[in-house]
Amino acid sequence: LIKILKNVQNEVRDKFTFQYKIVGSYSRNMITYDSKSNIGFDLDVNIYPNDDFNEYSPQEIKTTLIKAFRKYLKKYKYSKIENSTRVITIKVNDTKNARIIHSVDFAIVNDYEDEEGYQCQEYIRFNKKHNSYTWEEQDDGFYMLDEKIEWIKDEDLWPELREMYLKRKNSNNDINKKSRSLFAESVNNICDEYGYFE
């Protein structure tokens, strides 16, 4: 994964640079695997483009990255790339057994501070119906995740969070809902259920 990211960084360097961070369940030691399904594990990565002067539109940024990923897919055994609403997804497929070995979801994000001093994040959203790309603010559920997770750990609720996340992930039938969203929902539900918001 790191090798393909380094190649993509070099490929797009003439236009813009970017940093990346592995986020989601992997970064929190919550990778899951359901042996009964045809879906292997997945990873979530945030890509932070360095476009301080807003030289590139959201469409230019995302399509440039897709083109670069596509160039290196086969070299690293990835067989498919998808341009989803919130992420770019690449997959390693086991065609013989008709299953996904693993997939990686790349969200293109920008962290910033608003006028009131709050840390915020926006992501590039692809509207398939209108074939348009825009920067959109993250949903409220994505904010303060680290603080909520610390509270969950302090309250010894980590097993409850793992159980809820596993249940949500294994029963998820919405192909557009990625594990990072399911994890954030699980964190917020545990916080709501056990009194974080009181």
Predicted feature descriptions by range:
Residues D44-Y48, R70-L73, H130-E137:
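Glycine-rich loops and low-complexity Gly/Arg-rich segments
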Residues V12-F16, K62-D114:
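Conserved catalytic core of two-metal-ion nucleotidyltransferases
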Residues F53-T63:
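Short, conserved charged micro-motifs
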Residues L1-N7:
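Short, extreme N-terminal leader segments that mark the start of a protein/domain
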Residues N7-V23, K74-I90, N172-E185, Y194-E198:
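Short glycine-rich, low-complexity/disordered patches
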Residues N10-L43, I47-E55:
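Active-site nucleotide-donor binding segment shared across nucleotidyl transfer reactions
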Residues E82-S84, N97-E198:
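Right-hand nucleic-acid polymerase module
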